[in-house]
Amino acid sequence: MFLIYEYDIFWAFLIISSVIPILAFLISGVLSPISKGPEKLSSYESGIEPIGDAWLQFRIRYYMFALVFVVFDVETVFLYPWAMSFDVLGLSVFIEALIFVLILIVGSVYAWRKGALEWS
């Protein structure tokens, strides 16, 4: 039977972890000085006035490499706990992890063949 009072610690943690950031934003908004002017709108480059436009466009290749990095970073996050408890989990979890790695290998081969990993 589901009893709500069994989760008192969870609800307290959830409320506290939600209230603290909200309070931090509110307090910083109230205490921060309000200053507007052309100095605040200009870019700062080591004390020197910037030459040219401050906004630069990045090539899409940076984002592709970042996306591939995130995929393999998430793979590491999922495989590390599995590797630490490999001897306890058994054969079925080994097969599941093997399928997971094979799917990632297929994805990386696909990205490689599509040219997402080429720097040109």
From Swiss-Prot:
Its EC number is 7.1.1.-. Keywords: Chloroplast, Membrane, NAD, NADP, Plastid, Plastoquinone, Quinone, Thylakoid, Translocase, Transmembrane, Transmembrane helix, Transport. The keyword Transmembrane helix applies. It is an enzyme of class 7 (translocase). It is a multi-pass membrane protein. Its main location: plastid. InterPro entries: NAD(P)H_OxRDtase_bac/plastid (IPR023043), NADH_UbQ/plastoQ_OxRdtase_su3 (IPR000440), NDAH_ubi_oxred_su3_sf (IPR038430). The chain crosses the membrane at residues 9-29, 64-84, 88-108. Signal peptide: none annotated. One of its GO terms (cellular component) is chloroplast thylakoid membrane. It is found in: Plastid, Chloroplast thylakoid membrane. GO terms for molecular function: NADH dehydrogenase (ubiquinone) activity; quinone binding. GO terms for biological process: photosynthesis, light reaction. It comes from the Eukaryota. Pfam families: Oxidored_q4. It catalyses: a plastoquinone + NADH + (n+1) H(+)(in) = a plastoquinol + NAD(+) + n H(+)(out); a plastoquinone + NADPH + (n+1) H(+)(in) = a plastoquinol + NADP(+) + n H(+)(out). The keyword ATP-binding does not apply. Belongs to the complex I subunit 3 family. NDH shuttles electrons from NAD(P)H:plastoquinone, via FMN and iron-sulfur (Fe-S) centers, to quinones in the photosynthetic chain and possibly in a chloroplast respiratory chain. The immediate electron acceptor for the enzyme in this species is believed to be plastoquinone. Couples the redox reaction to proton translocation, and thus conserves the redox energy in a proton gradient. NDH is composed of at least 16 different subunits, 5 of which are encoded in the nucleus. This is NAD(P)H-quinone oxidoreductase subunit 3, chloroplastic. It comes from Manihot esculenta.
